[in-house]
């Protein structure tokens, strides 16, 4: 994998491009022949889509990045990083973790990848804690309801 020193932070993915900017990127891809357009044009379009606030755009961005990953071994490092961000934004945290773990495996000293890995792991942990809290609340409500029903029948 190539060693490029700059990758955007996760927070950068939340500064969405406006629809005109995304359309310019899309037109660039179409002008170059769509699926046969340059990897760079498709990559730029995919990153613009991932940054979108629209889930369908984000999903298309992830699909394009997946295609580029398969097609271009030279862009795999970048694709793993951006795929992690795309899946994170879509709430697909286990998939994001797979991508970032693969990147960190190849580049264990990459500080940006390590920071992204921490963010993904923290999100997975917080989602797990929320799930446990919801289950606990459900059990407590169920137990209270059963207790009230039993108490009501004793009267």
Swiss-Prot record:
Keywords: Membrane, Mitochondrion, Mitochondrion outer membrane, Repeat, TPR repeat, Transmembrane, Transmembrane helix. The C-terminus is required for mitochondrial localization, while the N-terminus is necessary for mitochondrial fission. It holds the Pfam family Fis1_TPR_C. Its main location: mitochondrion. Belongs to the FIS1 family. Residues 1-130 are cytoplasmic. One of its GO terms (biological process) is peroxisome fission. It is a single-pass membrane protein. GO terms for cellular component: mitochondrial outer membrane; peroxisomal membrane. This is Mitochondrial fission 1 protein. InterPro entries: Fis1, Fis1_cytosol, Fis1_TPR_C, Fis1_TPR_N, TPR-like_helical_dom_sf. SUPFAM superfamilies: TPR-like. Residues 151-155 are mitochondrial intermembrane. The keyword Membrane applies. The chain crosses the membrane at residues 131-150.
């Amino acid at each position: 994998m190539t060693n490029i020193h700059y990758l955007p932070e996760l927070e950068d993915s939340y500064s969405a491009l406006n629809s005109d900017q995304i359309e310019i990127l899309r037109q660039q891809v179409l002008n170059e022949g769509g699926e046969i357009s340059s990897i760079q044009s498709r990559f730029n379009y995919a990153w613009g889509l991932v940054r979108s606030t629209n889930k369908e755009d984000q999903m298309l961005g992830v699909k394009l990045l997946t295609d580029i990953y398969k097609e271009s071994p030279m862009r795999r490092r970048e694709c793993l990083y951006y795929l992690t961000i795309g899946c994170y934004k879509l709430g697909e945290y286990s998939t994001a973790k797979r991508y970032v773990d693969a990147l960190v495996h190849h580049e264990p000293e990459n500080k940006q990848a390590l920071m992204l890995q921490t963010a993904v792991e923290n999100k997975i942990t917080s989602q797990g804690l929320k799930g446990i809290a919801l289950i606990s609340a459900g059990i407590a409500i169920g137990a209270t309801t059963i207790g009230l029903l039993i108490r009501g029948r004793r009267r």
